[in-house]
Amino acid sequence: MKISQSAIKDFYNEDYCRIKWEEVYFNGYRTQPTPAMVDGLIFEDLTIGSSRGGEKYFIPKLKSGKPSKRELDLIKLSEFAKQTMKDLEIELIEVQPEWETDTLIGHPDALITYKGNKAIMDLKYTGVKEDESCRWNPYAWSDLEYKDFRQALHYVEMYYQKEGEYLTFFYLVFGKSGWVKFISVDITSSALDDYRMLLDTFRADLKSFTPKPIKSYKICRKCPILCNKRTETPNIINIEI
């Protein structure tokens, strides 16, 4: 299999079931996006012209046929995002490409120029507060020293393997409430070396991979993959007094 950054992230996530991992990354099972994910995909489509895979998502209209506040808020934020990109001198070169090398695969949001210089950009829409800390919430965008930046490493490494050039990686993050952050990820050679070692470790670990059930009622009851090894009842907590 060709390695994606999400495959590595989920493989080493203790709360991600091994059976689900096999279904998603080996067998091609596609999970349905949550409402929050749908909002993010619609925001991408409105802002840069496409979401991943070119799929279109829509928010149901009200009974009157008019757009809901949820839809109007996304439209308003996307217009702000487009103006922000213009103000930052960001120009789109390629939107939602699929990149492949001999061993890696990736789907960056956009190849761009920033003030005339080629770069990679990931566009984010989030409902978290501006000052919410990455230390406690992996989806937050404050206290960035705690953020997992393997996504940036993966795409920068891929582009280097494809084109022989290291590009700057940017996150352009828009909060549902209207805040915005433009983050440049300055990747050191040691960070890239560490990521290449992680790729080698992943390849080695994959050889001994066994799709074992996670045995967690909390996780299994929400899982869309109805395997015959799922935990159907709450786990027993034993206590001796």
Spell out what each predicted region is.
Residues 57, 131-133, 168-172:
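Short acidic alpha-helical/loop segments enriched in Asp/Glu that coordinate divalent cations
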Residues 97-98, 115, 123-126, 174-177:
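Histidine- and/or cysteine-centered catalytic micro-motif in compact active-site loops
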Residues 86-89, 112-120, 159-167:
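Secondary-structure boundary elements
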Residues 103-105, 118, 179-182:
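Short, mixed charged/polar active-site loops
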Residues 3, 67, 71-76, 82, ...:
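Metal-dependent nuclease catalytic regions and adjoining charged, substrate-binding loops involved
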Residues 1-108:
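Metal-dependent nuclease catalytic cores that hydrolyze phosphodiester bonds in DNA/RNA
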Residues 108-138, 155:
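Conserved catalytic cores of phosphodiester-cleaving nucleases, focusing on short active-site segments
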